[in-house]
Amino acid sequence: MISSNGLFDRAKKVIPGGVNSPVRAFRAVDLNPLFISRAKGSKLYDVEEREYIDYVCSWGPMILGHSNDLILKNVENVLHNGLSFGAPVETEVQIAEMIVSMVPGVEMVRMVNSGTEAVMSAIRLARGFTKRDKIIKFEGCYHGHSDSMLVKAGSGVLTAGIPDSLGVPQNAAGDTLTAVYNNISSVEQLFQENKNHIAAVIIEPVAANMGVIPPQEGFLKELSGICRQNSALLIFDEVITGFRLAAGGAQEYFGVEADIVTFGKIIGGGMPVGAYAGRKEIMEHVAPCGGVYQAGTLSGNPVAMAAGLAQLEILKSKPEIYEDINKKAEFLGNGFEKIVQKYKAPITLNRVGSLLCGFFSQNPVTNYQEAKLSNTNYYAAYFKSMLNKGIYLAPSQFEAMFVSSAHTYEDIDATLKAAEETLVENISLMEELI
């Protein structure tokens, strides 16, 4: 009989760590990973046919739930035409037109295969456009695994550009400067220390890779102003927030426009798709129009474009989806906070739209250093208990929960019931932490 443990044993013999992305290994929660066989709506099913209410949603793409009928139909309609041509197709034009029509400030779009590729290309474009080298990022924000973005976040190494991964040369990370999220003075200081050398500031408008941390009131607008004053570009990494917070992403949600925007996840409808986009005067610096080179054999893949286009068409034509998922997330968040207050659990909940995270900390969480104070051992205990009750959460304290349109209020009620039972089961551990 096939089992997750058996597959993991086999995988470890031929795949580093047994997984193709580190967080999937479940090491942070001291378990072996589940191997999934299928998914539908709000549910995942492992290879042993156990059912889970899924709040990972493939790390964000499945905003309409798994195996959406319209998306699958769109994919099925193009499959018989061929899987890859290495040539332009109509759907890549259609999806670019769709993005331009939905996202504020975007005039041109270039398709790639992942969020990492999108960010890597956007940074190269910013450097080519401004003819400057340095990039400011924020500690705790994740922008993919390209060398220049893998910079250690913490203490005196923040602005020194010390790599946060073996194999990243010092000079590759040396032009990456690190500021403190939600701290505008840390950004101003970097501009003062590096006058006329900063090409761009890149930020997750909502930091969703250190849990979920919203920007404080006015922070993004001030950041935009500082960039304009210093002739630097503002890059919004909307791989997670794009088409999730609103049809126009974080730019629409917060009313702040960036110069370049990167997309992934939702844009592919579950297929591997990324994109970077911006004003025409910037985007026309990309080859073959300009001298900033970027290419990809599978960029604009016809099958992936069909999936992404179908999802975006649904989101554009049914704006009520956003009100629906936000209300469900609010219902989930409010219910969870009532349980936390009832048992005086040391948990702080952050929510932006349909993104949530419960930090196992009694203190407010507004940046990376505060997020790091969370008790990961307690989160691991919470995760295990919730998983045993059929609730699939991210196997890390520092990841988001995603609510989809496929989640029902019955799903949420079951989740809250499991959460209360879990807190009761771990009450003695909670008391030790308070």
UniProtKB/Swiss-Prot annotation:
What cofactors are annotated for this protein?
A: pyridoxal 5'-phosphate
- Gene Ontology cellular-component annotations: cytoplasm
Single Gene Ontology BP annotation = protoporphyrinogen IX biosynthetic process
Question: Hey, what's the signal peptide range on this chain?
Answer: none
In the record, what terms sit under GO molecular function? Answer: glutamate-1-semialdehyde 2,1-aminomutase activity; pyridoxal phosphate binding; transaminase activity
Protein's name in the database: Glutamate-1-semialdehyde 2,1-aminomutase
Q: Which Pfam families match?
A: Aminotran_3
Q: Which InterPro entries match?
A: 4pyrrol_synth_GluAld_NH2Trfase (IPR004639), Aminotrans_3 (IPR005814), Aminotrans_3_PPA_site (IPR049704), PyrdxlP-dep_Trfase (IPR015424), PyrdxlP-dep_Trfase_major (IPR015421), PyrdxlP-dep_Trfase_small (IPR015422)
Name of the gene encoding the protein in the UniProt record: hemL
Protein EC: 5.4.3.8
The record's PROSITE patterns line, in alphabetical order, gives: AA_TRANSFER_CLASS_3
Going by the UniProt record, its keywords in alphabetical order are: Cytoplasm, Isomerase, Porphyrin biosynthesis, Pyridoxal phosphate
Q: Which organism is it from?
A: Ruminiclostridium cellulolyticum (strain ATCC 35319 / DSM 5812 / JCM 6584 / H10)
Is the keyword Isomerase assigned to this protein? Answer: yes
Per the UniProt entry, the disulfide pairs are none
Post-translational modification N6-(pyridoxal phosphate)lysine, affected residues? K265
Q: Which HAMAP family match?
A: HemL_aminotrans_3
Q: Please give the chief subcellular localization of this protein.
A: cytoplasm
> What is its pathway?
Porphyrin-containing compound metabolism; protoporphyrin-IX biosynthesis; 5-aminolevulinate from L-glutamyl-tRNA(Glu): step 2/2
Location(s), subcellular: Cytoplasm
- Reactions accelerated catalytically: (S)-4-amino-5-oxopentanoate = 5-aminolevulinate
Stated family: Belongs to the class-III pyridoxal-phosphate-dependent aminotransferase family. HemL subfamily.
Subunit (UniProt): Homodimer.
